[in-house]
Amino acid sequence: MMKITIAALGCIFVALADDMGVARKMSENKFAPLPGLPACATLAVESGDPSKGASVILLKGPAGCVIPWHWHTPTEQVMVVSGSAKVEMRDTGQASSLGPGGYAMMPSKHVHQFTCASACAAFVSSDAAFDIHYVDAKGGEIPPEAALSKKK
């Protein structure tokens, strides 16, 4: 089984203490790519420690950036902040176009795909340590290299 965790973010970002308030502009976030995710996607940790538990991440990507079919161990909630995105659900075949304020929730192990239809930013919230498991067309787990090397 191939599992990508967000542990690498601990080296890039300083997690906020739970008892501290914070307010910052989008331009003050420190975005960075993460191994195991498409190079087009960059992340900034807003709260929590995604390698250890519940967290909120701000994801940013250019038009056409695709995070291919995958699932997570935690429940994931996504809210688009800017631009437009498409969220596709494998089990229902549902594809939803979301603009600012658009919301999607994927329960644990729910296979989905996320695409920035235009340059987009979205909050990604998870209720436990964040991971990503890529799947092939039949739903079998595949290594990130295989998922990310496919032409979109």
Language-model features: where?
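Sec-dependent signal peptide recognition
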Residues: 1-8
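Hydrophobic h-region of N-terminal signal peptides that target proteins for export
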Residues: 9-17
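A short, N-terminal "cap"/entry segment at the start of jelly-roll beta-barrel domains
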Residues: 16-55, 137-152
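Conserved hydrophobic/aromatic beta-strand scaffold that supports enzyme active sites
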Residues: 43-45, 56-58, 77, 95-97, ...
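Short acidic-glycine-tyrosine-enriched beta hairpin
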Residues: 49-51, 62, 85, 90-109
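Short, conserved beta-strand element in jelly-roll/cupin
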Residues: 59-62, 71-87
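Short beta-strand His + acidic residue motifs that chelate non-heme Fe in jelly-roll/DSBH
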Residues: 67-69, 87-88, 106, 111-117
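Ligand-binding loop in jelly-roll beta-barrel domains
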Residues: 99, 108-132
